[in-house]
Amino acid sequence: MEKVFHLGLCIDDLKGAQLAIVPGDPDRAARISQFLDNPTCLAQTREFHVYLGQLNGHSVVVCSTGIGGPSTSIAVEELAQLGVRTFLRIGTTGAIQPHINEGDILVSQASVRLDGASQHFAPLSYPAVSDFFATQAMVQACKNLNIDFHIGITASSDTFYPGQERYDTHSGYVPKSLQGSCEEWQNLGVMNYEMESATLFTMCAALGLKAACVAGVLVNRTRQEIPNVDHGEIEKKSVAVVLEAAKVLLG
């Protein structure tokens, strides 16, 4: 097999890995890789930094996706071409329900499709839903580690500012079609905003792949917009969850 276009890897490079942990941040990918046995950097191309290591005796990939659905879809597609079948996303998030605390872990069952990339895989009537067993592994991981978590629906937006109804911007303006949208999602029980899960869930379900998503809460937007918590500690907690979930799935 020839090398895939963006990652620059061929199937032999992954040594049979069928599970990938997919953060957005390349630096976070590097940090996660250090929890694997014998980690090796396979590629560093644009936002895609790819590492291979061993977990419970199985080959596991860690690949950063960058921010948002379009680049996430590239990473997932090319990893799938290389044999990966399960994708565990790890990220950070802003909660919009008042009972959720900073530092809590959110496990996404499904996503509101506020993105555009997912529509290139299935129409809007198709649900952006996680894989049941991969999501159950995330839940089990939180329980195993005695970490406070919530499970529910996530709003997944293409944009960080207008799509999440943020007014702390250059213009301070949000288009009328999005004004009041945060309150609407709150009233519908949506837990949080992020920017990748709708694309990840939709494309994986449509392509016969498995996906789950976990995110650490940096801020609760019902109280404030700017995080003032220790990002590093929240990252450590969410990384612990995704690694434990991977172990559950790998057996």
Segments predicted by a language model, with ranges:
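Short acidic/polar active-site loop segments enriched in Thr and Asp
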Residues: R85-T86, M191, K210
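Active-site rim beta-loop-alpha module in soluble metabolic enzymes
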Residues: V129-G189
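Flexible, glycine/charged-enriched surface loops at secondary-structure junctions
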Residues: P39-Q44, N146-I153, L250-G251
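Glycine-rich beta-alpha junction loops
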Residues: P26, G94, A155-Y161, T199, ...
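Zn-dependent metallopeptidase/amidohydrolase metal-coordination segment
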Residues: A198-D230
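Metabolite-binding pocket within alpha/beta catalytic cores that recognizes anionic/polar moieties
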Residues: M1-N144
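His/Asp/Glu-rich mid-to-C-terminal helical/loop segments that flank catalytic regions of hydrolases
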Residues: R221-G251
